[in-house]
């Protein structure tokens, strides 16, 4: 497999939930560092880029060996779309980089338990299936297949079917929830449609524990404890 993949980590300075979360220490490393190191540890990835508007995030990222894409202010607001951020990064790469990359691996910095091995397996799935899009997911404890939707008249109907809420879980299709950890896609395909591919989408399944997403101080504390236990059990 050739190194035609580039990793993109999107990390703006502002955050509504946990302030400055991308640079908060987690087990001795800034939160974003876990994602940078995971990307660097995957042999299929040629270079690791961080798109940010924030000076501190940029300096930490460069110190860890990542390359920085300076994101304009208008793409760092609460209303800025991830699509526009990715398109900006692709345009930047095409202008600044000599090497042409076929695939992009988008990694959110708030998924510290996603490892190099996960990224490697997701890329291998992308290649093996000739997928247009691979997205990391987990199977939630309570399947949404058994959920209801509210109708305009106040009644409720089964989300999947009217029978699904009353069926055994094992008789229903598996349902997945995206965890935001890994998105693998073709750069040319993304540019063509200005969005993630909608067909030939394959799931890369991770455990619910590995899918931890840092949004609150409690999330950070839980992952800190998990990392301590993991280190003890080495």
Report residues per predicted region:
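Short active-site oxyanion
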Residues: 44-49, 132, 209-211
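Hydrophobic helical membrane-anchoring modules
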Residues: 203-205, 209-234
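Short, high-confidence coil segments that cap the C-terminus of an alpha-helix
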Residues: 45, 98-101, 128-131
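Short phosphate-binding loop-to-helix
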Residues: 55-103, 114-117, 121
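A short, N-terminal amphipathic alpha-helix
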Residues: 31-47
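Conserved core of the sugar-phosphate nucleotidyltransferase
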Residues: 84, 112-200
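N-terminal nucleotide-binding beta1-loop-alpha1 segment
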Residues: 1-19
